[in-house]
Design a protein with these regions (language model features):
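Short glycine/serine/threonine-rich phosphate/pyrophosphate-binding segments
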Residues: 29-32, 53-57, 77-86, 90, ...
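Phosphate/pyrophosphate-binding active-site segments
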Residues: 136, 295-385
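N-terminal cofactor/phosphate-binding cores enriched in small/glycine residues
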Residues: 2-87, 91-92
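Glycine-rich, anion-gripping cofactor-binding loops and their flanking helix/strand elements
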Residues: 63, 213-299, 399-429, 442-446
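Active-site diphosphate/adenylate-binding microenvironment
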Residues: 6-14, 18-19, 27, 32-37, ...
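Structural signature of the thiamine diphosphate
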Residues: 2, 19-20, 63-74, 79-100, ...
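Thiamine diphosphate
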Residues: 99, 107-114, 270, 308-311, ...
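Active-site nucleophile and cofactor-binding loops and adjacent substrate-binding regions
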Residues: 24-26, 45-56, 71-78, 133-134, ...
């Protein structure tokens, strides 16, 4: 069917079941926006006040919907404004497809008005980027972009499209499948290694599971809960893994790290086998990895082989999708008991006391604790960056249906308000709360307009 590339771009989004896009128009992306306007009954446009906030809104939408979300910007400063949001998504492995306009093909490299090398500028922060110069490549590029963004270790993909290309007329047909010879993520775990991992967990006297954000990325929340329950292994999380495991579960022992809770950190120091699932184990999670490696057998599951051994050595590395690997493990799992070990961990935290604030003041820890008690179970809490993030992570008690979103890797202030908007649009049935400090609020409060 003949149509313009802009119209074909809209058809690509429809084929990928995109219902909402977040962005801000400008001259270099106007042909695409005109086509979107004609499709307003199928795709809702959310007009943000700054391009990075469109990226953050797409970030929140992707986390709750579980599929790649779309943000749009024009060329030059519009595209460069988007880089912080791209880097934020990359650091936390969030699947977003970023579409930017570009100057006409014959003007690229001439330093014309609002020209910026966005593919080069964003290169460190994307899984892949495209400069779409051949109109006939439109369908293939979009199919690949959504596939790359949402598979393997998720992340942002950038498509930069010159204005003249958007206006070109092509014969459009969207491919049903995507085959990229150089990109084939390992999803299922090596069976021999899975058996070794299970043997190590069965032999352990003081096993401990550490959950990272990769469990959310793999949609493996139920699988990790089931395995932990069968084998009765206590659970801790990194910041990005918070809310995978409900706080009221007897196996849950809190967040690890510099800003974590005493009980979780003490458990790491005493365990004999540490089972890392989808966790990067960055500097805020484990300060002294070399010391831990000497005393503890470490099992590390991650879909990205580059993460295994990067920050902490692994005795038993296992590359694969957390959901599929955990299913393999559950099939082999035997019911076990670690009652004494779990009871001991519960004594390591000491008694947590709240100091009632003086009249006319607010204790933020008390505030967040009380907020958690008043909110419904199926709440999405979006924490910004700063001390408010730490208070939320340590004081908010999530129930099974709850979900925490935050910028854990990049630590991007101003994230919470637009991300909460995106999260709410992904699932309107969920209560959604943004928790932020005054500085972060002033960076993105205009999105409430």
């Amino acid at each position: 069917m003949k149509m313009t590339v802009s119209q074909a771009m809209v058809e690509c989004l429809k084929a990928e079941n995109v219902k909402v896009v977040f962005g801000y128009p400008g001259a270099a992306i106007c042909p695409f926006y005109d086509a979107l306007l004609d499709a307003e009954n199928d795709i809702r446009q959310v007009l943000v006040r700054q391009e990075a906030n469109g990226g953050h809104a797409a970030n929140g939408y992707a986390r709750i919907s579980g599929k790649p979300a779309v943000c749009i910007a024009t060329s030059g400063p519009g595209a460069t404004n988007l880089i912080t949001a791209i880097a934020t998504a990359y650091a936390d492995s969030i699947p977003i497809v970023c579409i930017t306009g570009q100057v006409n093909t014959d003007q690229i490299g001439s330093d014309v008005f609002q020209e910026a090398d966005i593919t080069g500028s964003a290169e460190p922060f994307v899984k892949h980027s495209y400069l779409l110069k051949d109109p006939e490549d439109t369908a293939r590029v979009f199919k690949e972009a959504f596939y790359i963004a949402g598979t393997g270790r998720p992340g942002p993909v950038l498509i930069d499209i010159p204005m003249d290309v958007q206006k070109a007329v092509i014969d459009f047909e969207y491919p049903e499948k995507c085959e990229i010879r150089s990109y084939k993520p390992t999803t299922k775990g090596n069976y021999v290694q899975v058996r070794r991992v299970m043997a190590a967990l069965e032999e352990a006297e003081k096993p401990l599971i550490c959950i990272g954000g990769g469990v959310f990325a793999a949609h493996a929340e139920n699988e990790i809960r089931e395995l932990a329950d069968i084998m009765q292994i206590p659970v801790i999380t990194t910041m990005m893994g918070i809310s995978v495991f409900p706080d009221d579960d007897p196996l849950f022992c809190g967040m690890i790290g510099t800003h974590g809770v005493k009980m979780a950190n003490a458990a790491v120091n005493e365990c004999d086998v540490l089972f890392l699932v989808g966790a990067r184990v960055g500097d805020r999670a484990v300060k002294t990895p070399l010391a831990l490696e000497k005393t503890t057998k470490i099992i590390h599951i991650d879909i990205d082989p580059a993460e295994i051994g990067k920050n902490i050595g692994a005795d038993l590395p296992l590359v694969g999708d957390a959901k599929l690997v955990l299913q393999q493990m559950t099939e082999l799992a035997k019911p076990m008991k670690h009652d004494e070990w779990i009871a001991h961990i519960k004594t390591l935290g000491g008694e947590r006391k709240y100091v009632e604030p003086a009249k006319g003041t607010v204790n933020p820890r008390v505030f967040i604790d009380r907020l958690a008690k008043k909110m419904p179970a199926n709440v999405t809490v979006v924490a910004d960056v700063g001390q408010n993030q730490i208070w939320t992570c340590t004081e908010y008690k999530f129930r099974k249906e709850g979900r925490l979103l935050t910028s854990g890797g990049m630590g991007t202030m101003g994230y919470s308000v637009p991300a909460a908007i995106g999260a709410k649009m992904a699932d309107n049935s969920r209560a959604t709360v943004a928790i932020c400090g005054d500085g972060a609020f002033q960076m993105s409060f205009m999105e409430l307009a």
